[in-house]
Every structure is written in C-alpha cells, then in structure tokens.
C-alpha cells in the first residue's frame, strides 16, 4: 500500500552516484572575479569553487550541474518527489519484489514531471506500483538533477552567487570541510542563496 508523503511517512536516503562533470565557474572565471593574475593557487581556488557549489546546493536543495542520485525508500509512496531540483530525468526505478528479487519498474507505469518544482514521479493513468517486499530500501530511484551538463545552462544569478561565495572563502581562509567553511557567511550572500531555496521539499 503506497503511503501519501515521502518525508513524513517513511525514511529515505539520498546518495550522489555520479558527480557533476564541471563546476559552475571555471578557474579562469574565478580568478578574474578574485583579481588573481598568477597560477600558484589554481588548485586551491578550484577547491573553493567546489565548496561554494556544494554549500549552495545543500541550502537550496538544488543541483547546479547535472548530477546523478539514487533515492532509496522502504516502499512506494503515492507520489515520489526527488529531493534535488531541478529534476532532469529518471534513469530507472527498481524494487525488491515479494520473492526477494530485484526488478525494474516499467517506464510506462509512471509519469515524470520535470516542469514542477520539486519534480514529481507519479503513476500513469490506470497504473499501480508493483508489490514490494517489506524491507528497508525496497525501492531505488535513480535520477538526474541539474540545469544541464554545461555550466552555461545555470541561471546567471546562481553563477554570480558561486563567484561571491568563492571570493568570501578566498578572503577568509578557513579549513574546507565537506563543502562548508567555518567562517560565517555574510548576510547579503546568505540571503541570495536562500532566495533560490526550493520551498517545497519532498
């Protein structure tokens, strides 16, 4: 029996399986914004750009560049809302059937709505989800989220925020830990980031 709400009714786990192939801004773009004209810190600047992207993605619940995720659920909800936006595509939905075997749900069973934010995966007309075994992580949704494979597809406002946050990290050099930095982010940058937060999370 499907449940109505993914977050409130069941636990879920999200894992990044394929990282973005590019960062939102290049090393050259970052150095131009920072007014750095030497190459001694290129690797360090690249690390700061990645950290800025990761923080922005965490707060906004977005993926700036196409990234592949797996979403694990204990059962099928009535509607699946992948917890990263914008939803680009659904690669597959697999499930553990009542005999304990892993099966792939036919794509004809569900519709993928990439226009709504967050995106939605819902049953097609006159279809139903397959029966699953009662166990943890019985349903696995593999999907791609992001504005595209190229940085040029990212909205200009978000690219500018990446530059601003990278500049803040560069000016206040603190250890980079899991995409975050210890120094408090200025209010104007934080406000710009929160403006892009997906309001309705799954």
Say what each PLM segment does.
Residues 1-202:
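Divalent metal-cofactor coordination and adjacent catalytic microenvironments
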């Amino acid at each position: 029996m499907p449940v109505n709400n993914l977050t409130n009714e069941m636990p879920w786990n999200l894992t990044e399986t394929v990282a973005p192939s590019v960062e939102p801004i290049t090393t050259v773009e970052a150095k131009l914004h920072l007014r750095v004209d030497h190459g001694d810190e290129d690797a360090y600047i690249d690390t700061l750009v990645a950290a800025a992207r990761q923080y922005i993605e965490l707060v906004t619940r977005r993926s700036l560049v196409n990234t592949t995720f797996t979403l694990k659920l204990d059962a099928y909800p009535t509607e699946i809302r992948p917890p990263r936006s914008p939803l680009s595509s659904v690669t597959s939905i697999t499930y553990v059937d009542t005999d304990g075997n892993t099966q792939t749900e036919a794509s004809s069973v569900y519709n993928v709505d990439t226009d709504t934010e967050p995106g939605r995966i819902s049953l097609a007309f006159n279809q139903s989800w397959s029966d699953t075994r009662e166990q943890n992580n019985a349903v696995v949704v593999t999907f791609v989220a992001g504005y595209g494979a190229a940085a040029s597809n990212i909205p200009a406002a978000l690219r500018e925020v990446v530059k601003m946050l990278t500049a803040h990290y560069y000016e206040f050099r603190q250890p980079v830990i899991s995409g975050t930095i210890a120094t408090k982010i200025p209010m104007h940058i934080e406000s710009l980031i929160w403006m892009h937060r997906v309001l309705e999370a799954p």
